Amino acid sequence: DRGLVEHAKTVGNYLQEELKRTIGSSDAVRDIRGSGLFIGVEMKDSTTTTSAVEQLMNNGILVGQTGPKNNVIKLRPPMTFQIEHADFLVQQLEKIHLSL
C-alpha cells in the first residue's frame, strides 16, 4: 500500500480538524464526521447543501450530495490527496460558507 492508508488517515484527520475549525460553528453546518478521507459535512437543509455542492463543482471540486435528507456534502478524494489539496478545499468551503 506504500503508506497510502496511513497517509489517508493523516490527511483526513487534518481535513476534518480544519473543517471544524473554519466552518464547524456555522449555523449552516450541523456536523462534520468521517473516517480517513471519507468525510461528510452535514448541512442544515438540502437547499443549502445543493447550493454548496454546485459552487464547489463550479470551482473544479468534485463532491457528492447524500444522506436521508439529502443534506450531506460527501467528500471522497483519492488516497493521494495532499495537505495542500485539503487547504484548498477548506478555503473554498470557507468562501462558500460566507455566501450561504
State what each model feature region is:
Residues D1-L100:
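Conserved N-terminal phosphate-binding loop of PLP-dependent enzymes in the Aspartate aminotransferase
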